[in-house]
Amino acid sequence: MILKDSTINNYATALFNIAVKEKLVDDYIIQVDALIQSLSDKDDFNKLVSFSNKQEKQDAILIIEKTFAPFEFDIYLINALKILVENQLFINTRMILKALYKKLLDYKNIVLGVVYSTEKLTKTQLSAIKKKISNKVNKKVELVNKIDPTLIGGIKVNVQGKVFDGSIKAKLEALKKQMNT
């Protein structure tokens, strides 16, 4: 069953409050991001933790424990995953985790952004871009690099709805506009 946004937010808020109360915000940022990434192909995992009888339910909960406990995920996060399995709501896990992740980042005054480039950026390049954009938006910025071959060259950064476009494509379009006026 797909949950309403308000219910997803309630789950995320409950986990956020635990993270703050237990002083686990930094740990949760890392762990929640890892969970989001590991559950990106959630359909297969969702099938593993679905059940139709009591024994399958116990097996599904055991799968959660055996999958995440060895990686030392926080017990509150593991228990939340178990609750979602028990209530057959695991399909909503990534949405809940994404809402939680956003709350955690907001709490730490960190914003997420995307840097588009024609090829994968090095850690040094990404770090330099983060620093420059952080100064522009007055917040710590975390960037994900996505490949966009339509840029021709250069980069385009999207943070908080703001676009910083240094791509050759954008420069050509600006030149085209100038020539047409």
Curated annotation (Swiss-Prot):
GO MF assignments: proton-transporting ATP synthase activity, rotational mechanism
Pfam families documented for this protein: OSCP
One cellular-component annotation, GO: plasma membrane
Assembly mode: F-type ATPases have 2 components, F(1) - the catalytic core - and F(0) - the membrane proton channel. F(1) has five subunits: alpha(3), beta(3), gamma(1), delta(1), epsilon(1). F(0) has three main subunits: a(1), b(2) and c(10-14). The alpha and beta chains form an alternating ring which encloses part of the gamma chain. F(1) is attached to F(0) by a central stalk formed by the gamma and epsilon chains, while a peripheral stalk is formed by the delta and b chains.
Biological role stated in the UniProt entry: F(1)F(0) ATP synthase produces ATP from ADP in the presence of a proton or sodium gradient. F-type ATPases consist of two structural domains, F(1) containing the extramembraneous catalytic core and F(0) containing the membrane proton channel, linked together by a central stalk and a peripheral stalk. During catalysis, ATP synthesis in the catalytic domain of F(1) is coupled via a rotary mechanism of the central stalk subunits to proton translocation. This protein is part of the stalk that links CF(0) to CF(1). It either transmits conformational changes from CF(0) to CF(1) or is implicated in proton conduction.
Entry similarity comment: Belongs to the ATPase delta chain family.
Descriptive protein name: ATP synthase subunit delta
Organism whose genome encodes this protein: Mycoplasma capricolum subsp. capricolum (strain California kid / ATCC 27343 / NCTC 10154)
Gene that this sequence comes from: atpH
